[in-house]
Curated annotation (Swiss-Prot):
Catalytic reaction(s) noted: H2O2 + AH2 = A + 2 H2O; 2 H2O2 = O2 + 2 H2O
InterPro entries associated with the record: Catalase_peroxidase, Haem_peroxidase, Haem_peroxidase_sf, Peroxidases_AS
Post-translational modification: Formation of the three residue Trp-Tyr-Met cross-link is important for the catalase, but not the peroxidase activity of the enzyme.
Organism: Vibrio cholerae serotype O1 (strain ATCC 39315 / El Tor Inaba N16961)
Annotated site residue numbers, Transition state stabilizer: R95
Family: Belongs to the peroxidase family. Peroxidase/catalase subfamily.
Function: Bifunctional enzyme with both catalase and broad-spectrum peroxidase activity.
UniProt xrefs under PROSITE patterns: PEROXIDASE_2 (PS00436), PEROXIDASE_4 (PS50873)
Entry cofactors: heme b
One cellular component term from this protein's GO annotations in UniProt: cytosol
UniProt-recorded name of the protein: Catalase-peroxidase
GO annotation, biological process: cellular response to hydrogen peroxide; hydrogen peroxide catabolic process
Length: 724
């Protein structure tokens, strides 16, 4: 072995060429390849706490009141390295919590504050999150003290809650239960722009048509949480900004009243920072030098802290007393005329005309100095937009009502991605059930499961009907925001009962049979639907020569239409389901990519996705009875035929359309089967083919059945947080 060349050029002979930082990855070489990495995230290999760590058990040891006291003390314990504005960190902590929770979007349930992802790229380095690294460093001594008993995710949101309480707001409540991740998510699409704060209309823009924001995005620019505070594309126009606000907040499931409350309540305290030159700031945390130790936006050319801090570039406080909860925001916004100006950093902002001296906030360091308050374009939208103005006027006239609406909206903002109340923990969990929590009443557990199974088996329903209905009921689950799933049996309610992908005619027939059995047995329809799917699988396994009992956990309840926000559930409608070989229409995204997205939301691994596809095909569960991918002559038997025939080199594959193929016998030229892209990707993609070959092996027929049952049970129980 010769190392002289590497050594003589100053390169390390051991690591030279190793994949440690910059290098061409497989995705760089083959950008159209499926990114299966999204199915393999956040496992024990990256978690320093180990596979046996149980956060809920750790929470039971937490002294909640002591933690809250420490957080309140932190608010006024100003540090020299990053001084608190007016001696109070409340505004900074609220912004940190807001921007942690505020990445949530209802379309796919991704984002939000439930994982502590603000600690990692890209969020830790978004322009809109500038200097929030300082907030997390201020929290570190408290995190260090309480250790595993409090996650970063919970701590960041709780810090925002305590900030509001320390300034006089009566909050609605708080729930612990957010578990930390240990590396950035690989499944969240933040946009395709190649630069921060890219304007609409440019390359890879998230906008099309008449300012139509790409789904599932809920922010107007790459690197922002919601809207541009200076105006659309940085051009002040409150009416246009109002439209951006309406879209982005709606994509977080917030209505106009909640939007006004959150905007005003967020700006009642704290300030924006732009008293200096943005050009003096160093790189963001991910781009900073090693010795910066994960801190970004450092100013090494001027003071850069206190009154000289630069963050957004906008400068000033919104209210006269920015460290207390009051109604001054609406007083100033609605009582004064406002004119457009620029901050010292060159950012557009609005300042009042002829404001009284006593209405001006004091300097963050010297109370003898007063400055004009300011408003962003988003704030001015609350005054100029007619609907927002009506709400603002009501809040101004009724401060108590404003405080109540804000407290509830803040709770919704910071808890929306946590899922049902079964996941909530702690002494401050509100007793009230809120419709956005998708409440489900508890179901019975004390009944004879085998007796119900016998009734289902004798009902005349086919294996396909039973399995398809159970799958359709459970497949709505999203591991992102913990919504959907079989619990509640909302498949029988609007809007789900009418979704095209649920085949309403077939669904209605099956539900009529199962509802009768549920009523006779005194159990929930939700349990009966899942149990029917299990019965179908057991029958299919027996037909394949394998005796198996599918695990079942009773206790699901039946939700009512009054407990269901129909509009909110519309976003759960499947546009495609590769497991049932169905697409509502053709999309830019390929069918196999949509399958991958669905599998990730169901929290499936690639092997689990693979075995489910193979099983669902031979069970005859395709949408509309389609024969695509049904590579078997024994439909209804849980065999590994799908994989055996997919990997058989006796066949060749020919495209017949955009998403259709024929599988042809090489010798005779006879068409044996038809398929879709979703079917053939398990023979085309090298990783998926490796899994398919495992299940095609002669010695793995029983393993296939057992693995299918395990993956099926995982999906059926995905929303059973009461079992944890």
């Amino acid at each position: 072995m010769e190392h002289n060349k590497a050594g003589s050029s100053g390169q390390c002979p051991v690591m030279h060429g190793g994949l440690t930082s910059a290098s061409m990855s497989n995705m760089d070489w083959w950008p159209k390849a499926l990114n299966l990495d999204i199915l393999h995230q956040h496992d024990s290999k990256t978690n320093p706490l180990g596979a046996d760590f149980n956060y809920r058990e750790e929470l039971k040891k937490l002294d909640v009141e002591a933690l809250k006291r420490d957080l309140k003390a932190l608010m006024t314990n100003s540090q020299e390295w990053w001084p608190a504005d007016w001696g109070h960190y409340g505004g900074l902590m609220i912004r940190m919590a807001w921007h942690s929770a505020g990445t949530y979007r209802i379309a796919d349930g991704r984002g939000g504050g439930g994982t502590g992802n603000q600690r990692f790229a890209p969020l830790n380095s978004w322009p809109d999150n500038a200097n929030l690294d300082k907030a997390r460093r201020l929290l570190w001594p408290i995190k260090q003290k309480y250790g595993n008993k409090i996650s970063w995710a919970d701590l960041m949101i709780l810090a925002g809650n305590m900030a509001y309480e320390s300034m006089g707001l009566k909050t609605f409540g708080f729930a612990f239960g957010r578990e930390d991740i240990w590396h950035p998510e690989k499944d969240i699409y933040w946009g395709s722009e190649k630069e921060w704060l890219a304007k609409s209309g440019g390359e890879n823009s998230r906008y099309s048509g008449q300012r139509d924001l790409e789904n599932p995005l809920a922010a107007v620019m790459m690197g922002l949480i919601y809207v541009n505070p200076e105006g659309v594309d940085g051009n002040p126009d409150p009416l246009k900004t109002a439209q951006d606000m309406r879209v982005t907040f709606a994509r977080m499931a917030m209505n106009d009243e909640e939007t006004v409350a959150l905007t005003a309540g967020g700006h009642t305290v704290g300030k924006a920072h732009g008293n200096g030159k943005a050009s003096n700031l160093g790189p963001d945390p991910e781009g900073a030098e090693l010795h910066e130790q994960g801190l970004g936006w450092n100013n090494h050319t001027s003071r850069g802290i206190g009154r000289n801090t630069v963050t957004s570039g906008i400068e000033g406080a919104w209210t006269t007393h920015p460290t207390r909860w009051d109604n001054e925001y609406f007083y100033l916004l609605l009582s004064y005329e406002w004119q457009l100006t620029k901050s010292p950093a060159g950012a557009w902002q609005w300042e009042p005309v002829n404001i009284k001296e006593e209405d001006k906030p004091v300097d963050v360091e010297d109370p003898s100095i007063r400055y004009n308050p300011m408003m962003t374009d988003a704030d001015m939208a609350l005054k100029i937009d007619p609907e927002y103005r009506k709400i603002s006027e009501r809040f101004y006239k009724d401060p108590a009502y404003f405080s109540e609406v804000f407290a509830r909206a803040w709770f919704k903002l910071t808890h929306r991605d946590m899922g049902p109340k079964a996941r909530y923990f702690g002494p401050d969990v509100p007793a009230e059930d809120l419709i956005w929590q998708d409440p489900v009443p508890a179901g019975r557990k004390d009944y004879d499961v085998n007796a119900v199974k016998a009734k289902i088996a004798a009902s005349g329903l086919s294996i396909s009907e039973m399995v398809s209905t159970a799958w359709d009921s459970a497949r709505t689950f999203r591991g992102s925001d913990k919504r959907g799933g079989a619990n509640g049996a909302r498949i029988r309610l609007a809007p789900q009962k009418d979704w095209e992908g649920n085949e309403p005619a077939r669904l209605g027939k099956v539900l009529a049979v199962l509802e009768k059995i549920a009523a006779e047995s005194g159990i929930s329809i939700a349990d009966t639907i899942v149990l029917a799917g299990n019965v179908g699988i057991e029958q299919a396994a027996k037909a394949a020569g394998v005796n198996v009992t599918v695990p079942f956990a009773p206790g699901r309840g039946d939700a009512t239409i009054e407990q269901t926000d129909v509009e909110s559930f519309e976003v759960l409608e499947p546009l495609a389901d590769g497991f049932r070989n169905w697409q509502k229409k053709h999309y830019v995204v390929t069918p196999e990519e949509m399958l991958l997205d669905k599998a990730q939301l169901l929290r499936l691994t690639a092997p689990e996705m693979t075995v489910l596809i193979g099983g669902m095909r031979v069970l005859g569960t395709n949408y509309g009875g389609s024969q695509h991918g049904v590579f078997t002559d024994r439909v209804g038997a849980l065999t590994n035929d799908f994989f055996v025939n997919l990997t058989d080199m006796s066949y060749t594959w020919k495209p017949t359309g955009r998403n259709s193929y024929e599988i042809v016998e090489r010798k005779s030229g006879k068409v044996k089967w038809t398929a879709t892209r979703v079917d053939l990707v398990f023979g085309s993609n090298s990783i998926l083919r490796a899994y398919a070959e495992v299940y095609a092996q002669d010695d793995n027929k029983e393993k296939f059945v057992k693995d299918f049952v395990a993956a099926w049970t995982k999906v059926m129980n995905a929303d059973r947080f009461d079992l944890v």
